[in-house]
Amino acid sequence: MDKFEKWLNKTLMPLASKMNKNHFISALSEAFMRCMPLTLGIALLTIIGYFPVPAWVDFLNSIGLAQHFSAVIGAVTSALAIYVTYNFAYSYVNRHEYNGHTAGLLSIASLLMLMPQIITVPVVKNIPTEFPKSAVVDSVSNVEAFQTVYTGSTGLIVAIIIGFIVSLVYIQLSKRNLVIKLPAGVPPMVVDSLSPAIISMVIFCLMFGIRVGFSYTPFHDIFNFSTQLIQAPLTGAVANPWVLMGIFTFGNFLWFFGIHPNLIGGILNPLLLTMSYANIDAYAAGKPVPYLQMMIVFAVGANAWGGSGNTYGLVISMFTAKSERYKQLLKLGAIPSIFNISEPLLFGLPMMLNPLFFIPLVFQPAILGTVALGLAKILYITNLNPMTALLPWTTPAPVRMAISGGLPFLIIFAICLVLNVLIYYPFFKVAYNKALEEEKAAVELEGSETA
C-alpha cells in the first residue's frame, strides 16, 4: 500500500495539480457553473410543467399552459450552447486579464455565424381541408431561421470549441496590440467598445473561412462534423452504463488517495450535460429518453447518492455506533450527507487512505449501478422524467428519484439503500468497535491516573 501510495503521489498528484491549474479545464468548469442560475431558476417550473402524473399533464394541455411551460423551459435548455460559449470565452480571456465580456460576445456571434440558417419547408398552394393520398410536394421554400438543435445540447461541443478558438485569437492579438488606439481623453467605455474592432474583424473573417470550408465537405457544416466524429463517439462511450460505472468507480478511487474527482469531472460533465439535455428534448417532445441507462446509473452511482462515496448507507450504519467519537461525527455529517455533501464523513472517519474503507468507498458505484439496472429491467422501466437534471445537485436522491420515476424508481431506491447499508455496515462495525476499545482504554487510563 505504501509503495502504491508513493506511486500515486508521484504520478497522479502532479497531473491533478496541473489539470486544476489548466486554464481550459478551469474555464470549462466555470462555464457550466455560471449556467446554474439559469437551470436552477427554471427548476420549479420544470417540476410543475413536467410532473410525472398523466392527469396533471393532460390538465395543463387542456387549459393551454403546457405550451407556455415548454417555451419558458426551452429558453434555457434549447439555448444552452449560446450561454456556454459566452461563459467559456469570458472565463478564459478574463483569466488572462483581458476583456472577457467582449470575447464572450464575439464567441456568441461566431457560433451563430457557423450555424445553418436556412430551413427548407414545402410550398403548398390552395391548401384543402384534407390532403388527398395522391398529393405530392412539387416545390420547396427556404426560410431563414436558427434551429434549436444547434443552440441546445447538440451544439455544446461546438460551443466549447468556438469559445476556445475565439479566446485564443483574442488573447494573442491583444498581446500584439492589434487594437485601435484612442486619445487619452476618450471615456473608458468608448475605448473598451472600439479598441477590439480589428480583432473582431479578424475573428469574423476566420469564422467565415471555417463556414465556407466546411460547406465543401461531406459534413456541410461544423455541427455535423462535431456530432459525427467527436460528440457521437464520446457520448456513445460514456452512455455505456459499464463505462459510466467505471468512471464513477475511478473517481471514488481517486478520493481514497485524497485526490478530488474534479480531475475527471471537468471533462465528463459536458458529455453528461449533453446527454441530459438530449433526454430533456426527447421527453418534452413526448418521446422515450435516448439515454435511459445513463439516468439509472447516475441516480444511484454518482455523487447524487449521499455525495462522493455514496454515503447514505454509511449514515444509517452510524446510528448503531456506541462510540462517542462516531456519535458526534454522525451529528456533524448526517444532514450534509442527505444533501449530497460527504466531505464531513470522508475527512472525519477518515475514509481516505484508510484500508478498512477502501472496498465500500471505491466499489459502491459499480455494485449499486449494476443492481439498479437489473431492477429497472425487472420493473420494466422504459422511460424516466429527465427534468430532474435541472435540479440542484444537493437535491436528496429519494426526492430526485420520486420525481423522475415515481413508485418504481422509489422501489429501486429502497432496495439499493438496503444494499448500500449492507455493504458499509461490516466495515463500519470494525471501525467503531476499534474506536470503542480506544475510548474504554482512555477512560481506564484516566481513572488509574486519578486514583
UniProtKB/Swiss-Prot annotation:
Keywords: Cell membrane, Membrane, Phosphotransferase system, Sugar transport, Transmembrane, Transmembrane helix, Transport. Pfam families: PTS_EIIC (PF02378). One of its GO terms (biological process) is phosphoenolpyruvate-dependent sugar phosphotransferase system. GO terms for molecular function: protein-N(PI)-phosphohistidine-sugar phosphotransferase activity. Residues 8-427 form the PTS EIIC type-3 domain. It comes from the Bacteria. It is a multi-pass membrane protein. It is found in: Cell membrane. One of its GO terms (cellular component) is plasma membrane. The keyword Flavoprotein does not apply. The chain crosses the membrane at residues 40-60, 69-89, 104-124, 151-171, 190-210, 239-259, 263-283, 296-316, 332-352, 356-376, 403-423. The keyword Repeat does not apply. PANTHER family: PERMEASE IIC COMPONENT, PTHR33989. NCBIfam families: lacE (TIGR00410). The phosphoenolpyruvate-dependent sugar phosphotransferase system (PTS), a major carbohydrate active transport system, catalyzes the phosphorylation of incoming sugar substrates concomitant with their translocation across the cell membrane. Involved in galactose transport with PtcA and PtcB. The EIIC type-3 domain forms the PTS system translocation channel and contains the specific substrate-binding site. This is PTS system galactose-specific EIIC component. It comes from Lactococcus lactis subsp. cremoris (strain MG1363). The lineage of its organism: Bacteria, Bacillati, Bacillota, Bacilli, Lactobacillales.
